A protein has these predicted regions:
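N-terminal auxiliary segments of SAM/dcSAM-dependent transferases
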Residues: 1-31
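Conserved alpha-helix/loop element of class I SAM-dependent methyltransferases that forms part
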Residues: 38, 53-70
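Class I SAM-dependent methyltransferase SAM/SAH-binding core
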Residues: 75-77, 81-128
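A short acidic, Gly/Pro-enriched loop at the edge of an enzyme's catalytic core
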Residues: 127-139
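A short SAM/SAH-binding and catalytic strip from SAM-dependent methyltransferases
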Residues: 138-150
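A short glycine-rich, Lys/Arg-flanked "PGG" loop and its adjoining helix->strand segment in the class I
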Residues: 152-164
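Conserved beta-strand signature within the Rossmann-like core of class I S-adenosyl-L-methionine
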Residues: 166-172
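Conserved Class I S-adenosyl-L-methionine
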Residues: 201-259
């Protein structure tokens, strides 16, 4: 799940995520992450309309609240279907929030679905951000960077568009064999690490809570004859198994600052 040949990565993204957008748009699926839940359970107050997405929202909430976003200029790289962007704009009150994604269909969906003051969506590449230097106070990236062919280039771009003192708020996973290289890339980035922690347990718990919702989505988007196979071999199912203690995947949450 978390490693693809770099030569094919962006082609895979363009096909899979555009296909997913077309299939899931009518189901109002605005979050694509696995979810997150703590023990004891988090007490994040949500509106009735947000409640069905609680566990995906909680991953955004936990990642984004590592820094103050009120009154800040925020960029999210890999914004997916825009649910996290909408939630953070409504609750953390940044001055502006820009969601960027490589999937043009996803960006068009975001523009139709999320119409809020200060929120905009842009099609673009994480490894070549279409913004001037020092444009943002914070950059958010959640469960997306494992697909970038040149992760170190992405980190350099993050540092470039951040103002001095700005924050990079980040959560993602890597296969066990890739963790060492991941950590080296992060250590070599032109950013200072503020905090890091493993969140395998919390993500697995969130996935458990999200199970029925994702089964519903799969059933609605998949022909009946294929539903059993898709459920068994869906990436989320494999990731859930890989996130077990001592398993094949390590999921971590980070906060960095630009000095």
């Amino acid at each position: 799940m978390f490693k693809l040949n770099a030569q094919f990565t962006q082609g895979v993204q363009k096909f899979i995520y555009r296909h997913a957008t077309r299939k899931l748009e009518t189901e109002n699926v605005v979050f694509l992450n696995y979810g997150y839940e703590e023990d004891p359970a988090m007490d994040v107050p949500l509106s009735a309309s947000d409640e069905p997405d609680r566990y995906s929202i909680q991953l955004y909430h936990s990642t984004a609240t590592q820094a103050e976003l009120d009154g800040r200029r925020v960029l999210e790289v890999g914004c997916g279907h825009g649910g996290g962007a909408s939630y953070l704009v409504r609750t953390l009150h940044p001055t502006s929030y820009t969601g960027l994604d490589l999937n043009p269909d996803g960006i068009e969906y975001c523009r139709r679905r999320h119409n809020l003051p200060g929120l905009e969506f842009t099609h673009g590449d994480a490894q070549n951000l279409p913004f001037t230097d020092q444009s943002f106070d914070a950059v958010i990236n959640i469960e997306s960077s494992h697909l970038y062919p040149q992760f170190s280039v992405f980190l350099t771009e993050v540092a470039r568009v951040l103002r001095p003192g700005g924050h990079f708020l980040y959560a993602d996973a890597r296969s066990a064999q890739d963790v060492a290289g991941w950590k080296v890339a992060l250590a070599n980035a032109p950013l200072r690490m503020v905090s890091e922690r493993g969140i395998n347990v919390e993500v697995r718990r969130g996935m458990e809570k999200n199970l029925e919702r994702w089964r519903y989505v799969i059933d609605r988007a998949t022909p009946a004859i294929l539903r059993g196979v898709i459920r068994r071999f869906a990436p989320a199912q494999r990731a859930y198994e890989d996130l077990r203690s001592g398993g094949a995947v390590e999921y971590r949450m980070y906060s960095f600052t630009k000095v």
